[in-house]
A protein has these predicted regions:
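Bacterial N-terminal signal peptides
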Residues: 10-21
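Low-complexity, Gly/Ser/Thr/Pro-rich intrinsically disordered linker/tail segments
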Residues: 192, 198-259
Length: 259
């Protein structure tokens, strides 16, 4: 009995370590709908990536977080979704991190003071980001230049968003906005927006779908479920195609750095 108990404790500790090391790669209950392909996978993947790259290249924004995130994407040669320790080699275009690692590196490169303000000098967790963003004003920037964006339709390139379920082992997810949100004409409770993130599960119209590096840094369409007041209440992981929303009972909050 003692040996069996010890084994169970070891398994539990390893499981706790795995989920606490970084963000989850996708919500717990995604409901994807896979479109039929009419061309070869390689041709389709190359065309999709080129289309996404063109969309990102056309973004007009002076936001420092956006510029930092886009620089990583545009210079990327190799990427992978991994928990710490991360590998970030800008000279060779290698980016291996999870969603938190991506957001951290983009923000540190954009404005180190704004990054350190969140964790008060320590490396922030997703919970730390959530607590910090939740306290922000939606109108007046704090000393570090941060405001909260309350409604998904008001998001802009460079805004940082996250979801998590406090008090659970679910470590949530983080992403950076890269486009202008638009309400799905077929589903009025869904704000569709292009994002950059690091994940193991691509979104819709995603640069990682069929690519050589299918996990890690990339861009796709996320759907943010909103209530009648425009507040975020859930996520459609594959924006516009997921048949149902997940993460309905979680914290979903976004912050904007204005400098």
């Amino acid at each position: 009995m003692v040996r069996r108990s010890a084994l169970l404790w070891c398994v539990l500790i390893l499981a706790l370590f795995a989920v606490s090391a970084g963000c989850m790669s996708a919500p717990a209950t995604p409901s994807p709908a896979t479109p039929a392909m009419t061309a070869s996978p390689a041709t389709t993947a190359a065309a999709a990536h080129a289309s996404v790259a063109d969309q990102l290249a056309s973004v007009k924004s002076d936001n420092l977080v956006w510029k930092s995130a886009y620089r990583m994407f545009s210079t990327m040669k190799s990427t992978e979704y991994v928990h710490p320790p991360y590998t970030v080699d800008e000279a060779n275009g290698t980016y291996k991190f999870d969603c938190l690692g991506f957001a951290d590196h983009a923000l540190m490169d954009a404005d180190m003071a704004a990054y350190t303000a969140i964790g008060k000098g320590a490396n922030p967790s997703i919970e730390t980001y959530a607590a910090y963003f939740s306290r922000l004003s939606t109108t007046t920037p704090d000393a570090a230049g941060w405001t909260k964006v309350a409604h998904p339709v008001d998001l802009a390139p460079g805004d940082i968003c996250l979801w998590l379920k406090p008090g659970t082992l679910d470590t949530g997810h983080m992403w950076i906005i890269t486009g202008t949100p638009a309400i799905n004409p077929k589903r009025s409770d869904e704000a569709l927006v292009r994002i950059l993130d690091s994940t193991g599960t691509p979104h819709s119209d995603d640069s990682r779908t069929g690519a050589a590096d299918r996990t890690g840094l990339g861009s796709g369409i996320l759907g943010m479920m909103v209530d009648s007041g425009g507040n975020p209440i859930g996520l459609y992981w594959e924006g516009g195609t997921s048949t149902g929303a997940g993460e309905k009972d979680t914290t979903i909050v976004c912050g904007r750095l204005s400098k």
